[in-house]
């Protein structure tokens, strides 16, 4: 169940994020670095590394809510705070992809034998 951090950022649990993604209600933005994203990612997540992040470059009036994710929740919270500083709604996924995997949710990895992406359980 979602909750709000002390600085008013909405925080979703991984299972909620998975459901909202499946329903097309959110845009999941992964703020990890490209090498982290290449190693494993959540299906449907878009990459926008925090190291080059500019919250003003994200859509402000799209039909889907933007939810940020990272490895453990710190960088995604930073991105959400930056977006909120612009007066835009923002949310992040608690625990990042680490928590996502701990809950057994699937990630996409590259099969080293074929070079193709494969979805595997977390």
Predicted regions and their residues:
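Short, surface-exposed ligand- or partner-binding patches at beta-edge/loop junctions that are enriched
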Residues: 69
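Rhodanese-like catalytic fold shared by cysteine-dependent sulfurtransferases
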Residues: 1-27, 34-65, 74-122
């Amino acid at each position: 169940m979602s909750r709000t951090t002390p600085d008013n950022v909405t925080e979703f649990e991984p299972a909620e994020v998975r459901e909202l993604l499946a329903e097309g209600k959110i845009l999941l933005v992964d703020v990890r670095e490209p090498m982290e994203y290449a190693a494993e990612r959540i299906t449907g997540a878009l990459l926008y590394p925090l190291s080059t992040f500019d919250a003003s470059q994200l859509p402000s009036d799209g039909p889907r809510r933007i939810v940020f994710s990272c490895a453990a929740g710190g960088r995604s919270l930073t991105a959400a705070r930056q977006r909120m500083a612009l007066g835009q709604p923002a949310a992040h996924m608690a625990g990042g992809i680490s928590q996502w995997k701990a809950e057994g949710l699937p990630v996409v990895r590259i099969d080293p034998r074929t070079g193709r992406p494969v979805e595997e359980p977390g």
